[in-house]
Regions:
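Domain-scale recognition of functional cores that engage charged ligands
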Residues: 1-181
């Protein structure tokens, strides 16, 4: 990112600063794909005070088979079977938290809310005032959104669900051709 630091270095330093400022454990856990997990662990090893007792610094999201565009059959790559798989995307965080037992571990520690952000969004940081508001108002979910620009072709977007009119976060993979935002 800058001065020899990675996104992970900056995040680790942000978390450690917040812990010091508020005298709170503030766990940080990274969801990785099978392709990024080892590199993430190697970078975070430089921060021995980062792990919170009883919680891992990272967990693996699921993997799903790559599909051919022409017939949607699984890709076959005998020379390197790892290339037959891909990470499913950000929406897998909820399923992977449950599948790995991490959701139960967090609940068992009394943790009720989670702050989720892409690692490359360094402007997003855990804000204690927002956490206090969530608790005080008993808000179950909060998302920070911004107006999309022409550069925001990737990623999810807000949509109104037809079945009940609720606003939902819709991943691009869920968009019917012709209904792109």
């Amino acid at each position: 990112v800058r001065d020899g630091l990675t996104f992970l270095d900056v995040i680790a330093r942000q978390v450690l600063a917040l812990r010091a400022q508020y005298a709170a454990p503030l766990p940080v856990i990274f969801m990785n794909s099978f392709r990024t997990h080892e590199e993430t662990e190697a970078i975070l090893a430089a921060y021995p005070d980062l792990p919170v007792r009883g919680l891992p610094l990272g967990f693996l999201q699921s993997a799903e088979p790559k599909l051919r565009v022409d017939d949607l059959s699984p890709v076959d790559w005998p020379a390197n079977p790892e290339l037959e798989w891909c990470p499913p995307g950000h929406g897998d965080v909820y399923l992977s938290l449950a599948r790995t037992g991490l959701l139960d571990a967090l609940r068992g520690m009394g943790i009720r809310y989670a702050f989720l952000s892409n690692a490359d969004n360094l402007g997003a940081t855990c804000d204690p005032d927002i956490a206090a508001w969530l608790l005080r108002e008993q808000v179950p979910y909060l998302a920070e959104v911004c107006t999309r620009t022409v550069n925001d072709r990737k990623g999810g977007h807000l949509a109104r669900r037809r079945s009940d009119g609720r606003i939902v976060l819709r991943d691009n993979a869920m968009v019917v051709p012709g209904e792109e935002p």
